[in-house]
Amino acid sequence: MITKVILDFETSGLNPYHDDIIEIAMKVMDSDKQFTTLIKPKSNECISDEITSLTGITNEMLGKKGQFWGEAYQSMNEWLHSVRGDNDKIVIISHNGESFDFIFLRRILNDLNKILGCQNIFPIHKIIFIDTLLLAKRLLPRRYSYKQFSLCKFFNINTEGCHRAMNDVIALEKLYFNLENKLDNELDKRRKVSQNPEMVFDYIKLK
């Protein structure tokens, strides 16, 4: 079975091409395998009071507990290799990933390429990217909001502690499980969507 990883970043702002990652959380779906770390901003700039209010992450926390970005990225890279195992590909699931988290992830892998060389970084062409925001828009048309918090509320999923990366990951794991089940019912396939993530990717891309 292909490994499915739930991903969330907390960042210093909303620009995925410029802002800093300040927290990474990843979790293998239906498993206790997880990776999380705080990261000192790569730009060496302090995070704003607005970001602290939203996430609960302070500059003091980053200074005391945050890893330097190169160390954090390498640790994440090693963890991805370890959970991929013998599988040819890996699925990475995030909410609003296409416009945000997946862009940050590509930046991480690009930065790692400069440090480690292409032979050691996790191969991006082996990743199947699934954006639960796009999936929800296909499965639940005409909703007033597709924010993760709103969708979790729709499925009665606990969102306590939201806007810390691992808490968001745990909630998103449950949200994706519900969306998978809904897609199973809609497609009425003998082959379960949970065992064939390519079907989810193809469904999202259908016009």
Model-derived features: where do they sit?
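Substrate-recognition/cap helix-loop segment adjacent to the acidic, metal-dependent catalytic center
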Residues: 100-128
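Active-site catalytic microenvironments for nucleophilic, acid-base chemistry
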Residues: 107-112, 138, 154, 175-182
